[in-house]
Amino acid sequence: METPRRVEHQQTDRGYVPVYTTGIVEQPWDTYTAEDHRTWATLFERQQALLVERAAPEFMAAVADLRMSAAQIPKFSELNALMERATGWRLVGVEGLLPELVFFDHLANRRFPVTWWIRRPEQVDYIAEPDLFHDLFGHVPLLMNPLFADYMQAYGKGGVKASGIGPEALMNLTRLYWYTVEFGLISTPKGLRIYGSGIVSSKGESIYCLESAAPNRIGFDLERVMRTKYRIDTFQKSYFVIDGFQDLIRATEPDFTPIYERLKEAAAIPAGDVLPSDRVFHRGTGEGWSNEGDV
């Protein structure tokens, strides 16, 4: 079998430029090197140790249910057998970042795209784009949770619809994904815990999001989140807290079309702002924030 391409962002004098791909590929598991498996083991062991008292219990339970371990990079085929029985989801291999509409269509059909290649050893602490570890360890476990699995499918269907409405609707929806799927927190009887994939796959942000005084931690509100800018190059200025995964299901039940119309008239909210109407878990000090770069 020919090894699929490794499609990575391109570094320019203006930063990283995204490079998109569209095809589905078979996971070339037999081509992973010993170094690839060591990189997986390093990342897996580090995050497992960090997340014991930081991640949502549903996430930790799902990692165990999927039989993920440091021993080797998991095989998509073995994970699919477990996921399809649990929630009807399956993984599809991809070479890199997908265009929005292609990505939405996969989610709408309970397929989660996973980048087949893993970062290099020198990228263990940071990589500009999603790799196998981010996708597989960060995103896949919660697809075993029925509520979160339903939310992801509903999000995909909403994305397909928003693609036909216009760029403003897509931006609103992108912010929802960013502040829930990628960087969401959940309130538990033991305190705030992490469920967002961008956090659970990151050593630094796993600590920062819960323990630093700098960021805001604000109760989840759908339209507030859809108006809020975010950061792609640093840790977040604000994190939004759900009370349970049912909050996400309730958020996606209504037709978003009138919401998009309302939000056209509402100004975007800077990433670090706290509003008088916010339910504030913690008002951040703003230490170390950049005044530029919100998107």
Where are these regions (language model features)?
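A contiguous, surface-oriented mixed alpha/beta subdomain in the mid-to-C-terminal portion of proteins
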Residues: 122-251
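The feature captures two recurrent sequence modes
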Residues: 1-143, 225, 237-295
